[in-house]
Structure formats: structure tokens, C-alpha cells
Amino acid sequence: WNMSQNGQRWEVFRLSNIAHNTLTINGERHLVKSNAPITCTFESKKQKGAEVDLSSVFANSVKKAVRTVILDQKDHLEVTDRLETGDKEAAVSWIMVTPAEAKITGKNRMELTKDGQRMLLTVDADTEVEMKTWSNVPPHEYDFRNPGTIRVGFKTVIPTNRAAQLKVRLIPLK
């Protein structure tokens, strides 16, 4: 048990990147010896948010990875990932853990429902996306269970030597 890149610690479901609100690229673990600096923060009457450079986290998979998260004055959340591939394509999984029930309602859209409240999750991407829900049941008997939660999001493939933007909006519904 250790914190190295191939340490058994990362086989624990809750500690792996596939069980968190983040990207997984080419099915690979995030790089342990990476750094994800906050490169910009902003706050105005219209919006507040931050930008994080995830390039070193995904250095084995893509040339560049930047995530911007914005909350606007209407409480709409926008998560934008800008990725740039090199000599290999990037199979990207965008995942969010939620206690809500999820229903895919159309191309690049999903509705989340919890305690009578509803939220729309939409994806605007430069590539084709496949909306997905995943069980949150861990693969190993020794893992803690995650009752009442699922993972939602999408999968997409970014071709070699290409820049792409993946923009997710979470919009409360009345």
C-alpha cells in the first residue's frame, strides 16, 4: 500500500479518478506526481469561477487540459474542458457523482431529479458524445459501498493532433 503511481491505493474505487467528478482519459489513472494549479479566478456580478490547468495530470494522454468552472447569477453551473491531443487520440469520460436519479432525455441532454427538484445537464462539444449513466457499485469486495449514488456524464473521442472543447451546463429547472 503506497502513494506511488501504481500503488494499490488507486485500486480502491473511492480513491480512483473514475469515482470522482473529473475526467478520465484513455482509462488511465491521474498522474500522482502532477500539479494542477489554479491559473485564474474571477468574480463579478454576472459570474464567478476559476480555471485550473490539468495538463500535468493528463500528461501521458494529452498535450493540454484546462478546466474552467463558472457559476452565473442565475445559479447555472458551467464546466468547460479544453483538451489538446498529440500523437494519440483521447477517449474521454466526463463523470459526475450524484445522489439524483438520471434520465437521458435527448442528444447531449440528461435530466437529474432529487427530492422534487430537477436539473438539466447539457453537453456542447466539438466531438460526438454518448450520454451515460454508470453504477456506483465498487468492483472489489473490500471497497466501501456508495448507496444512493450514481455516476452520470458522457464519453467522447478526440482525434489525434486536435483541440476540442467540452462544455457542460447544469441548469436548475422550475
Predicted regions and their residues:
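CBM-like, beta-strand-rich accessory domains located in the C-terminal region of large
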Residues: 1-174
